[in-house]
A protein has these predicted regions:
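Extended alpha-helical scaffolding segments
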Residues: 1-46
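Specific register positions within alpha-helical solenoid repeats of the TPR/Sel1-like families, i.e.
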Residues: 6-7, 278, 312, 346
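Alpha-solenoid helical-repeat scaffolds
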Residues: 141-330
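Conserved small/polar residues in nucleotide/adenosyl-binding loops
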Residues: 349-351
Length: 351
């Protein structure tokens, strides 16, 4: 809202007053930083979806015949996949494959908070529940009126499953509703069989997964991530989404908002945001902030190295060379900078 209506906020001083009051709360600035980083991470969603569809799934299909030769999947039991009974050949088979490397990368993205579930649920948003605009941003709860007539003594397993889904930190609220309504499409007997298999062990696993994610990212970070994923689905998948301006097509450079600048214009905040842009290969966005930092810090060779790298990645070889030479003046011992300077000179000669 602050970004969409950034030109109007100055007309409402009470908004700035409210932010000033919130700024006295411990952790307020950290929360703003987290929100900004999560919006940057949301840019990766389409990339992740394409990687799944174009790389990981085809690789799994190619690997399937080889896997069945090494492992008899029909005779495989849960005990074979746990404890010290794991066949080392199976582990090496996965780790040595292209798929194994991609799955490790995929797992790291999930731990970071990336939206790895979007492609799974993109076609499961056609239930009547999602025709109601407000339902797209509702926290998942078994108290919802849609579940009122579902719980009887005969389907206690369903209630247990819903309770467990509430704690699934790796899924946003919208996807939890999608999963439930999809399962309700199954025939009663098939659904009952599935629910019975959803025993306390599965519940314990979800709880453990939740604790692991929260311990690595923090509870607040997890909630922020889930909300932004819900928001992403609304702007991309809601039946009437074309009636709204898709905020995820905007730059979302919150650090440039006048109303937020008093809280995130410090060196630490700007550096964190710029480093995250750089790590995600958004070189133009990172460069804008690095240039801003360079105005007050002309003595950091690392800063000018990064400015040079961003300019080089953006195709500005002359600008990159200038930044690298400045970095070399500050620290002539960096072999990386010397190689970059040589590379820029070589490229400029051949232009």
């Amino acid at each position: 809202t602050l970004y969409t209506y950034r030109k109007r906020t100055q007309l409402y001083p009470q908004i700035a007053d409210r932010l000033a009051a919130l700024a006295e709360t411990p952790g307020f600035i950290k929360t703003i930083r987290t929100i900004i980083l999560r919006f940057i991470l949301a840019r990766e969603t389409e990339k992740i979806t394409r990687k799944l569809q174009d790389e990981i799934i085809p690789e799994m299909l190619k690997l399937s015949p080889k896997l069945s030769k090494k492992i008899n999947l029909n005779e495989l039991t849960p005990e074979d996949l746990t404890g010290n009974e794991m066949n080392p050949e199976w582990e090496s088979f996965f780790s040595d494959s292209t798929l194994g490397k991609k799955m490790v990368e995929f797992g790291e993205l999930q731990q970071e908070g990336a939206d790895v579930m979007h492609s799974t649920f993109v076609h499961l948003k056609n239930f009547p529940f999602f025709h109601e605009l407000s339902n797209w941003l509702l926290p998942f709860t078994i108290e919802h009126s849609y579940f009122d007539d579902q719980f009887t003594p005969d389907n206690e397993a369903e209630k247990q499953m819903l309770d467990s889904m509430t704690f699934a930190a790796f899924m946003c609220n919208s996807d939890k509703y999608s999963l439930y309504f999809s399962m309700m499409q199954l025939p009663k007997e098939a659904r009952k069989m599935m629910m019975n298999q959803f025993d306390s062990q599965a519940t314990e696993m979800i709880q453990q997964n939740k604790e692991e994610l929260i311990s690595k990212r923090g509870k607040q970070d997890t909630i922020i991530g889930q909300y932004i994923q819900d928001l992403y689905r609304f702007f991309k998948l809601y039946p009437g989404h074309l009636d709204f301006t898709d905020i995820f097509t905007m730059p979302l450079d919150f650090h440039n908002l006048a109303i937020l600048r008093p809280y995130i214009s410090d060196k630490e905040s700007l550096t964190n945001i710029a480093e995250y842009y750089l790590r995600k290969n958004y070189f133009s966005d990172a460069l804008t902030i690095f240039n801003q930092l360079a105005k007050t810090d002309q003595d950091s060779d690392i800063l000018f190295q990064k400015i040079g790298y961003c300019k080089q990645m953006e195709g500005d070889l002359k600008g990159a060379l200038e930044a690298y030479l400045h970095a070399d003046l500050l620290n002539s011992e960096s072999k990386w900078v010397i190689r970059r300077i040589a590379g820029c000179y070589l490229s400029l000669i051949h232009i």
